[in-house]
A protein has these predicted regions:
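C-terminal substrate-binding/catalytic lobe of Rossmann-fold NAD(P)-dependent oxidoreductases
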Residues: 1-27, 101-204
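Rossmann-like NAD(P)-binding element
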Residues: 22-41, 51-52
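Structural motif
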Residues: 33, 57-58, 193-194
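Rossmann-fold NAD(P)-binding glycine/threonine-rich loop
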Residues: 37-44, 56-79, 84-88, 92-97
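Short glycine/serine/threonine/alanine-rich loop segments
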Residues: 51, 75, 132
């Protein structure tokens, strides 16, 4: 992949941007959307350059979270498995629903067939808000680029259905850039989307 056109690799159209091994001196931060399975080599790379990191990979395990937490003592680390702020507004809404009184709760997610983790990190995050184990999440992979998460609560005589859809994955890139503007001069610490969203909404 090194020295290949990033546009040619991802979109089959050259864009003048080349994959390089080294960062330029004026790099402000690193945004990482790559596969989380290479975490050890990534951490070695992050330590070498000591730049703030927005870590957008999904599917990291507890050990990976501990490694990133330790890394945040050396440089600012922002963990954002989903860079859409509306997902975190949705999570707050789910917490406000009295899930314990529901007779049945279901969570489903649909992503492009190239997505590796099943279920997605976002689906697991949403399931955690209502106490659903990840093996109960319904997973669908399709040829569509849409990302869809659905949550259904069934009560005695009522049903609540919530759906969040992303129709174009550029939403994630735009979200990452908004985070970058807020984050790149922050002090060494571990950051999450909740803090970012609360500050945007004027909460401390």
């Amino acid at each position: 992949m090194l020295f290949r056109s990033s546009g040619k690799f991802h979109f089959n159209k050259k864009n003048g941007l080349i994959f390089k091994k080294d960062l330029s001196e004026n790099t402000d931060l690193i945004i990482d959307f790559s596969n989380s399975k290479q975490l050890n080599s990534k951490i070695k790379f992050f330590k070498e350059y000591k730049k703030p990191v927005i870590f957008c990979s999904t599917g990291i395990d507890k050990n990976g979270e501990k490694q990133l937490h330790a890394l945040s003592k050396l440089m600012p680390i922002f963990i954002a498995p989903n860079t859409s702020k509306n997902i975190f507004i949705l999570a707050a809404l789910l917490r406000d629903i009295n899930a314990s009184s529901a007779g049945y709760i279901s969570i489903s997610e649909t992503h492009h067939k190239s997505k590796i983790d099943r279920p997605s990190g976002t689906a697991i995050f949403l399931a955690n808000q209502v106490g659903i184990p990840k093996n109960k999440i319904k997973v669908t992979r399709s040829t569509s680029n849409k990302s869809i998460h659905k949550i259904k609560f069934i009560f005695n005589d009522e049903t609540i259905e919530i759906k969040h859809s992303i129709n174009d994955r550029k939403v994630f890139a735009e979200g990452a850039l908004k985070i970058a503007k807020w984050f790149y001069q922050k002090p060494k610490k571990l950051y999450h989307m909740q803090t970012f969203v609360e500050e945007l909404n004027g909460k401390k």
